[in-house]
């Protein structure tokens, strides 16, 4: 399958979860899993849960998470749940990331949390 189509469908599912089209987004996540696109599928599931206010369930995906790009979602869940110590640890880890986008996220979130 064309990778650009896979990417567009994953983006559609993310947008859909933000618009409360969770069932549809999860259908796309299941399809992506069948294609071996596990990171994209996991992102959609986490986004859908977080957009429903189900932060604890979304945070459960953090255990054994092999994809650093998903860590900001877990930080947001920890913030919503008031898990300050866990959030501090996660932001410290992200701050030391070799990925500048993750390090920037950590710095920005730290600044927001302090205000």
From Swiss-Prot:
InterPro entries per UniProt: T3SS_YscG_PscG (IPR013348), TPR-like_helical_dom_sf (IPR011990)
Compartments (UniProt record): Cytoplasm
Predominant localisation class: cytoplasm
GO terms, biological process: protein secretion by the type III secretion system
Keyword Cytoplasm: yes
KO phenotype (gene knockout): Deletion mutant looses the capacity to lyse macrophages, indicating the absence of a functional T3SS.
Alphabetically ordered keywords of this record: Cytoplasm, Virulence
Pfam families from the UniProt entry: Type_III_YscG
Function comment: Chaperone of the type III secretion system (T3SS), also called injectisome, which is used to inject bacterial effector proteins into eukaryotic host cells, facilitating the establishment and dissemination of infection. Along with PscE, prevents premature polymerization of the PscF/SctF needle protein within the cytoplasm. Required for type III secretion needle assembly. Also required for cytotoxicity by influencing PscF/SctF levels.
SUBUNIT field: Forms a stable heterotrimeric complex with PscE and PscF/SctF in the cytoplasm. Co-stabilized by PscE.
Record family assignment: Belongs to the YscG family.
Protein name: Type 3 secretion system chaperone PscG
Organism: Pseudomonas aeruginosa (strain ATCC 15692 / DSM 22644 / CIP 104116 / JCM 14847 / LMG 12228 / 1C / PRS 101 / PAO1)
């Amino acid at each position: 399958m064309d990778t650009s189509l896979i990417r567009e469908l994953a983006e559609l599912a993310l947008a859909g979860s933000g618009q409360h089209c969770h069932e549809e987004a999860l259908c796309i996540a299941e399809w992506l899993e069948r294609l071996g696109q596990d990171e994209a599928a996991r992102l959609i599931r986490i986004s859908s849960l977080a957009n429903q206010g189900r932060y604890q369930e979304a945070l459960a995906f953090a255990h054994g998470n092999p994809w650093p790009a998903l860590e900001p979602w877990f930080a947001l869940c920890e913030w919503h749940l008031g898990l300050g110590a866990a959030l501090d640890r996660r932001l410290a880890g992200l701050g030391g990331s070799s990925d500048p986008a993750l390090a920037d996220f950590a710095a920005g979130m730290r600044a927001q949390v302090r205000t």
